[in-house]
Amino acid sequence: QVFGDTDVLLVGDYNSYAYEQPIQTIVQAGYADMVMQYDSTGYSYVYHSEAGYLDRVFASPSMATQVKMVGAYHLNTDYFYSRGYKRGLDNTMFRYSDHDPVLIRVQLSPASDSNL
């Protein structure tokens, strides 16, 4: 808000599931949980065969209307060690983390000519 722009995304590994207090605190502060809106049955992390989202995308009300897609890009969690994917030991993009990256597509409001 220092810059006067209310379009805010909070993105990262929150190490908490949707029902846990840290996530609920952010939602209660007025941020929309974009993962729950666009990919509520998806996952970005798997541990002992339990899949879920620890990686979150939250949007301020003005930004939430500009978010058009949120979803995990499954290039890590689905490639586990028993299948021969060893972390960082080959030249592929697979299994470099225990989390999948979360992709976000936004459609920003066009700038008016007076702002150019």
Model-derived regions, located:
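Metal-dependent phosphoester-hydrolase catalytic domains
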Residues: Q1-L9, Y14-A111
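Proline-enriched interdomain boundary motifs that mark the N-terminal boundary
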Residues: S112-L116
